[in-house]
């Protein structure tokens, strides 16, 4: 199968985030996103974009990108540089499903409605950046997911 034909036959999924201090909740989001299609693209916030939102990443973009690329659910990592790039990404990568955490419900509906399926996934209970680091619950599953 040619790469061009494969692009059109595969169900393509995209998600966005900073994925700084990667934890089990992130791994679960990526696993569930991958289950929704054949090819998962992660748009990773650049250091500059994070700074524009008033956030400073603990790990650099390149370090976070390397960690995400090591996760078996992730097929491609691309930079997220602006809020408005989502529409362009949908077209450029032939996206079928846009996936993000349910804390963003409604935020991107107007921008993406009719262009692709929009899926808001619930947060993993008791896990997340808000609960602090390190997140120990489910650590073995997270470690296993890092091995391709």
Description of each model-found segment:
Residues 2-148:
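Nucleotidyltransferase catalytic core that binds NTPs
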